[in-house]
Amino acid sequence: GVYLYLQALKKGDSRAERILRLISSNGGNRSGMAFGAVDSFGNVHPDQFTQSVTFGNVNESSFGEIWTNPHNELLQALKERKKYLKGRCAACRWLDLCNGNFRARAAALGDLWQSDPACYLSDEEIK
């Protein structure tokens, strides 16, 4: 993503602009937005890595009902995550391209909305 673009740009690689166009086209991490995961018990999660968050169960409601439930505050927040993100992510100039990256890693440290602890960009690169 952004790291590859910045490295290509630093090296004067002619593919830098193509990389930027490609990463600009998808809007970054889309967990809980454009895709989710259903585990073997029928539980619906934002992705296959965030098993600690469950939105419902397909044995009780259809996936469509679960995924579009306007009363599920966490699911709705994930779909509008940019206004909830904290720390480095909230201030990052690349937020539109990575979308806060991987929420499961932040959740593993206790706060789904905190910065991704494995962000590969330096403080200088996010400003």
Language-model regions: role of each:
Residues 38-39:
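Short, acidic, Ser/Thr-enriched surface-loop or helix-capping motifs
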Residues 105-118:
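Short cysteine/histidine-rich metal-coordination sites, predominantly Zn2+-binding motifs
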Residues 77-81, 115-127:
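Short Fe-S-cluster ligation motifs
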Residues 29-32:
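Short, small/polar residue-rich loop motifs at catalytic or cofactor-binding pockets
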Residues 1-18, 43-93, 99, 104:
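C-terminal accessory region of radical SAM enzymes
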Residues 21-22:
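Active-site-proximal, Lys/Arg-enriched surface segment
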